[in-house]
Amino acid sequence: EILIDFHDTPQFIYDNSSLKEIQACQHVWASGLRTEPITIPAGNKSEMMVISFKKGMAASFFPFPMEEIADSVVDADLVWGTDFGELRERLLGTKDIDLRFRIVEEFLIKEFRSQMAVNPCVAFAISEMTERPDALNIARMNERIGYSKKHFAEMFRRQVGVTPKSYLKIMRFQKAVK
């Protein structure tokens, strides 16, 4: 996810147990796939835009393997330079929600179109895990895909951020919560 905060006051991430501030986030930041919950307050005057990618499909938008940002929150400038800061400034120039979405969509397509290739085997696995997490057996899926367990797990981790087994656990949890 990419989070754009329209206020200048930092948002804080809190330790889930002690609720102590552990990280400040300001303006624009990126969050990898999470295997654990994150505690961020959303006050009644918060104004943010969150870009959530389709499940497992964020890799095309990041300049490094997704495993490097899993369970992390990183300042967008460290990931992409100042491009997202400039995007934020453009978004601050309008209050029209529909226009903000069009600006973000145009920006993402312009900046990342050439990188939007997705490994078809990983896309297939994500689709299977998302659509029927309770019925899926990873070993049988690996056999269908045709890669060794180790090779496929590495491909999957680089594109999604976690192993197929961890991703399947997340999908099962999300299904149970629904």
Give the residues covered by each predicted segment:
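Alpha-helical bundle regulatory/interaction domains
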Residues: 1-133, 137-139, 143-149, 162-163
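Residues within the DNA-recognition helix of helix-turn-helix
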Residues: 155
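Terminal helix-turn-helix DNA-binding modules in bacterial transcription factors
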Residues: 159-163, 167-178
